[in-house]
Amino acid sequence: MSEIPGILPSQEMDAAIASGVISADLAIPDGQVQPASIDLRLSNTAYRVRASFLPGANATVADKLKNFTMHKIDLTDGAVLEKGCVYIVPLQESLKLPADTSGMANPKSSTGRLDIFTRVITDGAAEFDRIEAGYSGPLYAEISPLT
């Protein structure tokens, strides 16, 4: 990966995928890598939780889900998510970032047009949408339909 600070171009994203820095349950299709980003994909399960949360230092999202899950929803054939509810969905992609590489996430514009609030959570996170340098682990989406 580049020694120059800034956003990784698609060529470096492709190299990160090839080297296992970015990996996924299913192969990452070419169209998923954009000029300076990668589109993250939902897994087949959503967990309805009482409220939004961050795991905090030394805690995992999976451990928090054991305590906070109200319902488990199969997304395989699609599902309707309830307005005003909070869902946590594991993403297909995971990361093994080098110690000098961090990440940021932001929703696609289509989520705003659909009036859905989304953000990314990582294990040990104290902040949404920020992935600490050297992070190694799964990624999760918090999804809250607004209308």
Language model regions located:
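Non-catalytic terminal segments and appended small domains
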Residues: M1-T147
